[in-house]
Amino acid sequence: MKKLLFAIPLVVPFYSHSAETVESCLAKPHTENSFTNVWKDDKTLDRYANYEGCLWNATGVVVCTGDETQCYGTWVPIGLAIPENEGGGSEGGGSEGGGSEGGGTKPPEYGDTPIPGYTYINPLDGTYPPGTEQNPANPNPSLEESQPLNTFMFQNNRFRNRQGALTVYTGTVTQGTDPVKTYYQYTPVSSKAMYDAYWNGKFRDCAFHSGFNEDPFVCEYQGQSSDLPQPPVNAGGGSGGGSGGGSEGGGSEGGGSEGGGSEGGGSGGGSGSGDFDYEKMANANKGAMTENADENALQSDAKGKLDSVATDYGAAIDGFIGDVSGLANGNGATGDFAGSNSQMAQVGDGDNSPLMNNFRQYLPSLPQSVECRPYVFGAGKPYEFSIDCDKINLFRGVFAFLLYVATFMYVFSTFANILRNKES
């Protein structure tokens, strides 16, 4: 008896329920972490895990171990944790034992027909006015680039709650010509939103918030199982206990991490592997790289840096030209040439010696113009004659014009020949 009393504190916390609510779970921040006991949805290929009483969905680039039961990524809370002991293994067992759909009696809350006193809701029966809360007379469909999260299947239709309305997947729509983009279309079918409070694949509870009725209507709901999420995807074997054995079957729905049921026998197990979703990873990378991109800010930053570099280079070039000019004109060695004062002091007058004076002796003596004087032939002779300056200046002008024209034609012909050779 003492041993039994000693074991009670160990058993009670293990089976205690979390005090989390849907609102508190959704308010939790995203976390980049590695979670264990991960399962994957076969249809959407999304990965899920229970942590601290909440259900988490892996987003972004997800890296998993070989058996895909431990994954690293950006985990986002999407609702309450899925109970891990509600039907497992091969779903066999004894009376009220292993599995909600096993060999024993089905628990009434998981029945396929409504329980007396409970309300059965069919979202497709048209009893609710179509449309959205914003515009009930015009149900505008929403277009999604990829299949959204938090959808559920009912009567072979995929539903989603959006902006207080229940929407149904109505196929794909293409838009644009270059490129052509394909969208997933969800059309409102009711002004009431539905949610599954337990995320266990059986819609036990639903709440309808109507745009036409301020009071929310809460009901018990009996329907088909959900496709997202439906733990465990990698369901393993295991048999429920004997008569009365197991709370609802062996294994934590095939997880294998906690052995048998909460009170019954059976060993959880199993493993699974799936295909890597390259498209989903590409979309996640694209979103992560572009979500904070500000084209105007990037252009402004690049322009500012280029202007700064250009200003620095311009100042350096102007300073160097000034130093060379001062050195050539005898104003002393400054700036980049200040370090050569000691060597230049040994030459002439040091840094005050204009360098140009040393080169002028090597320059050719160019002809200088003189004042025009009349040209006289045979001065003092009987055949003496002269040419006045006005005629000489006229000849100079005409001859200079001919030289200019000839020079222009020569230069033009030279460049034209170069261009012709390049084209050929």
Curated annotation (Swiss-Prot):
GO CC aspect terms: host cell membrane; membrane; viral capsid
Region (CT): 275-424
Keywords: Capsid protein, Disulfide bond, Host membrane, Host-virus interaction, Membrane, Signal, Transmembrane, Transmembrane helix, Viral attachment to host adhesion receptor, Viral attachment to host cell, Viral attachment to host cell pilus, Viral attachment to host entry receptor, Viral extrusion, Viral penetration into host cytoplasm, Viral penetration into host cytoplasm via pilus retraction, Viral release from host cell, Virion, Virus entry into host cell
Feature: compositional bias, Gly residues: 86-105, 235-273
Subunit structure: Interacts with G6P; this interaction is required for proper integration of G3P and G6P into the virion. Interacts with G8P. Interacts with the tip of the host pilus. Interacts (via N-terminus) with host TolA. Interacts (via transmembrane domain) with host TolQ (via 2nd and 3rd transmembrane domains); this interaction allows the phage translocation across the host inner membrane. Interacts (via transmembrane domain) with host TolR (via transmembrane domain); this interaction allows the phage translocation across the host inner membrane.
Region feature Disordered, mapped onto this chain: 83-147, 222-279
Residue ranges, compositional bias (Polar residues): 132-147
Signal sequence residues: 1-18
Family designation: Belongs to the inovirus G3P protein family.
Positions of region (N2): 142-228
One BP annotation, GO: entry receptor-mediated virion attachment to host cell
InterPro entries: Attachment_G3P_N, Attachment_G3P_N_sf, Phage_G3P_N2_sf
Region of interest (N1), ranges: 19-85
Described function: Plays essential roles both in the penetration of the viral genome into the bacterial host via pilus retraction and in the extrusion process. During the initial step of infection, G3P mediates adsorption of the phage to its primary receptor, the tip of host F-pilus. Attachment of the phage causes pilus retraction bringing the viral particle into close proximity of the host cell inner membrane.
Domain writeup: Consists of 3 domains (N1/D1, N2/D2, and CT) separated by glycine-rich repeats and a C-terminal transmembrane segment. The N2 domain interacts with the F pilus, whereas the N1 domain forms a complex with the C-terminal domain of TolA at later stages of the infection process. The C-terminal domain is required for release of viral particles from the host bacterial membrane and proper integration of G3P and G6P proteins in the virion.
Residue intervals passing through the bilayer: 398-418
UniProt subcellular location: Virion; Host membrane
S-S bridge residues: C25-C54, C64-C71, C206-C219
Annotated segments matching region Hinge: 105-141
Annotated protein name in UniProt: Attachment protein G3P
Chain intervals for the UniProt region annotation (Not essential for gene 3 function): 253-262
